Amino acid sequence: MSERSVGIVATNYHTIEGEFQLEGGHTLKNIRLAYETYGNLNKEKSNAILVCHALTGDAHAAGRHSDDDKKPGWWDDIIGPGKALDTDRYFVLCSNVLGGCKGTTGPASLDPDTGRQYGITFPVITIRDMVNVQKRLIDHMGITTLFAVVGGSMGGMQTLQWCVAYPELVKKAVVIASTAVSSPQQIAFNEVGRNAIISDPDWNGGDYYEGEPPVNGLSTARMIAHITYLSDASMHEKFGRRLQQGESYKFDMSNDFQVGSYLKYQGDTFTGRFDANSYLYATKAVDYFDLSMNGSLAEGLKYVQAKMLVISITSDWLYSPYHSKKIVEGLTVKEHDVSYREIESSYGHDAFLLESGQINYVIHNFLTHTSVADVMTEKVATIREGASIDTAAKVMFEEALTHLPVVNENGCLVGIVTSWDISKAVALKCSKLENIMTRDVLTAFPDEPIVAAAKRMERHSISALPVVDEKNRLIGIIDSEDINRLIG
């Protein structure tokens, strides 16, 4: 399939009415959430993928808002028809985080109690607060299962938090260039950036919205952070020790080197699109992020149910491969389904935004390698062997079933009854279940590819397969609708 753009898109808004409880104990009223969607939600609402943005990102992840836009959304290379997050197949959703400044309630928003911007009176938030707000949006859309949650950097933290806070909702998760526990070094860089903002006289205790914003402090904070997004190799390649002007030093305090001019440009342009107070709150949320429990990351991740893909960047020194491997170790201890990939790149941390070829390849392979467990229905109505046909018919009618597995007292599969079997029993005046049920039942295993199960169903002209574990205990069922929805 050729890769195309999602085209012209619009930002949508949802208001969470009433008071919203935050992890720190405070509440916020009537939170407004900015979000964008790409692709179509299927009838079963089972194809949704939530994309979580990084520290200074926003909801505009793909497409353009108008034909005049110079740049598309920040992950346009990954989201769209034929791309890893294929909008011909998935319903992709991205929202601006709580505390942000791109449409979602944050420090620059009006406090309904005062009619003025919150400023520094905005309550301190956490990654979990961000995720809880996203959950309310998912609920509003009627989505009860996320096919995947995907995010890089701070977006990876949100992805992990989703898997921990709402394990039953997330089928798959992709964590890119991130960590499960913010390190002292990462906290230190954030602290220096916050101090640069707070030290700017124009910050004015966070109350600057009717005056001059603290552009110098915010620009410096961005310059500091941007260094951590690059690698030594990429800076050597891009700038080396090349001078900004001429071939000799100026021997004054002006900027001599190209790398300095580049950082200043990054800082200055950043002040035109981001709020200084939002930067304070977002970095604080990152500092607080720690999914370990009693010092053990394995304990903190023990309830994760999603199939996980953890991706690191070889040259990333902000969230180095070490941090990704610690996530994998924490998941492996409890035997969670996790795979790990390293992206070879000299771009540093920003490679998750720049290495679109590798990122597309790895994510596409992970999302499309669908197993039976990814799509099976886990809550299956059953009937015990020895039950009457009348009982079976009643269960099938009340649950609107065409297939009813028969199990023994240990939950092991011993047969299956279909709606055709019930019709046959009525015609032949049978009363015993064992006279009509199929005993030699074709089954599937949870870890086998869905394609293999689909071929088995087609070969035998059946429309459902019970899913069993290694001891033949029933753990789920898949039917032709599940197959058609996924592989057409």
UniProtKB/Swiss-Prot annotation:
Protein localization: Cytoplasm
Residue intervals of the CBS domain: 376-433, 437-488
UniProt xrefs under InterPro entries: AB_hydrolase_1, AB_hydrolase_fold, CBS_dom, CBS_dom_sf, HAT_MetX-like
Gene Ontology terms describing biological process: homoserine metabolic process; methionine biosynthetic process
Active-site residues (renumbered): S153, D316, H349
Domain AB hydrolase-1 residue range list: 47-355
Family statement drawn from the similarity comment of this UniProt entry: Belongs to the AB hydrolase superfamily. MetX family.
Protein's name according to its UniProt entry: Homoserine O-acetyltransferase
